[in-house]
Amino acid sequence: REKNTFRRGGPSRRGDDFRRTEPLRQTEAESTGSGVAGRNAVLELLNSGRSVDKIYIQTGAREGSVTVIVAEAAKRGVPAVDADRRKLDMLCGGVAHQGVAALASEVEYVGLADILRIAEERGEAPFIVVADSINDPHNLGALIRSACCAGAHGIVIPKRRAVQVTPAVIKSSAGAVEHIAVARVSNLAAAIDELKEKNVWIYAVEADGEPYYDKDFSTGGCAFVLGSEGEGVSRLLRDKADFIVAIPMYGGVGSLNVSAAASVVIFEAARQRHK
């Protein structure tokens, strides 16, 4: 592995926890993880191949984009039934549902090895996004959508001290979570070490790094680490990164939110990778 000057962290550690597959766990108010809220999210769910038990349509809302959802449900043999707003609110656990919700089989997290296998099956160098302790469901949902649209092979999130893939995240991703692999790991540092063992370059996106557009993302695998809204990338993951990259700011505001920052950097990586 040779490249320009880089930061290297401590010794690699290997763990088996990111090879497990396990169902998403959510609160009872979120219908034990099987409630999906919002028109785009439900439509993407129907197109994903995941098992769908039933679609609920708010009474009187069968018009506009809802007719497309009902037609798609009919093609898949999924019943679409009317329900009052109270039932929808209860099913969705307070998430805005736009008059449409679904009951589906639980989404499953994949392992880190599965994401690497996806890249291998596509004949591509790994392209991964690592979410370091992001707590806002809207930011995580938007980050997942950006990663999916940029062609990333998967996104990695921690099991603790971070938002999980809840109905709010699914809705904020506009259903993109149905089309990208999400790995949940016990130890992000160990996951980073595993990626480095697989010759994946680690880029931490921070305010004080080198301009991202000066980097070559086209040679070899790459993983982009994005930190939480208030704290940024943790010291441990920053120290393990090969490169620290930044988005130069030219206006009166000093930063972008995490999903916007991710979009800027990972779409540049996608551009370079598809030259």
Residue positions per predicted region:
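RNA substrate-binding interface of SAM-dependent RNA methyltransferases
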Residues: 47-50, 120-210, 214
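Short, acidic/turn-prone active-site loops that include or flank metal/cofactor-
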Residues: 60-62, 86, 160-162, 229-231, ...
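N-terminal positively charged helical leader segments and presequences
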Residues: 1-118
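Active-site/ligand-binding-proximal alpha/beta "capping" segment
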Residues: 203-257
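Structured adenosyl-cofactor binding patch, chiefly the S-adenosyl-L-methionine
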Residues: 43, 48-49, 149, 170-176, ...
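Short, glycine/polar-rich helix-capping loops at beta-to-alpha or helix-loop-helix junctions
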Residues: 66, 162-168, 231-240
